[in-house]
Amino acid sequence: MANEALGPLFHNALIPQFVAARKKLNISQLEMDEILGVAKGLVSKWECGIRKPSGWLFCCWADALNMTIQLQPKVQNNDSQPRS
């Protein structure tokens, strides 16, 4: 899968969960910047889709929100298999 295809998945499926968790914990974006030790305004850029966090910062962000990241195998679609 090309990196371009991951953008909408990342922003539409994952980021709203991070935003909801941050708001539930009553943490501002600027406070989250400080917790993570990142530049002022970076969490805002992640949440708006302007920038994407590195894998490491993504894991740190989840941890700061008392969340875990779980990987699951892709569901195979029979239509995508080559036909002979």
Can you name each region flagged by the protein language model?
Residues 22, 33, 62:
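The alpha-helix within a helix-turn-helix
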Residues 26-45:
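Short alpha-helical DNA-recognition segment
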Residues 47, 57, 65:
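DNA major-groove recognition helix of helix-turn-helix
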